[in-house]
Amino acid sequence: MEGEKLIEDRGFLAAPLTFVVVVVFQLLSKWLDQLKKKGSKNTRESELRTEIKQLLREASALSQPATFAQAAKLRRSAATKEKELAQYLEQHHKEIKLSYDMYGKGLLASKVVIYLILVLCFWRTPIAIIAKQLVQPFGTLLSWGTGGHMTGHVMVGIIPWLILSNRVSKYVCRFVEF
């Protein structure tokens, strides 16, 4: 019963709280990826698009031979606006990518720090105790890093628990939409 005492000493909520931390990191990562893919619509881009549409609409309305020069001028103006929009979008996408990459690196760094803290706090301490029949072929893998054995039970270590939690949270996050 020394394993149960170890779990009581460290807190019986260690496994669920660790899982929640892993799920939160997965959700934040997915949210950041979706924001990066979606991008952001802003007023400058929408203004340029409406101006281009308006100029092309006016140019197509002028189909008389007498108004050909004016229609050509409107089309050239629309073409310059399209070039301006393309340059603006390129610059805007670079800025967005840079900022999201910075947030992604910050998220990764905080994930690594939190995982290291969890490993240091729970090294050689079981996170959970599971009946040996439930995890028959994987018992030794799950008990890696716990430093002890119990008859009839498998003590789950922090590193296998983090790996398992990470895989399960990735699966769960596939069904979450933002």
From Swiss-Prot:
Residues 1-11, 132-143 are lumenal. Disruption phenotype: Strong reduction of root hair length. GO terms for cellular component: endoplasmic reticulum membrane; GET complex. Keywords: Endoplasmic reticulum, Membrane, Receptor, Transmembrane, Transmembrane helix. GO terms for biological process: root hair elongation; tail-anchored membrane protein insertion into ER membrane. It is found in: Endoplasmic reticulum membrane. Its main location: endoplasmic reticulum. InterPro entries: Get1. It comes from the Eukaryota. Pfam families: CHD5. Residues 33-110, 165-178 are cytoplasmic. The chain crosses the membrane at residues 12-32, 111-131, 144-164. Required for the post-translational delivery of tail-anchored (TA) proteins to the endoplasmic reticulum. Acts as a membrane receptor for soluble GET3, which recognizes and selectively binds the transmembrane domain of TA proteins in the cytosol. Involved in the control of root hair growth through the regulation of syntaxin SYP123 expression. Forms homodimers. Interacts with GET3A. Belongs to the WRB/GET1 family. This is Protein GET1. It comes from Arabidopsis thaliana (Mouse-ear cress).
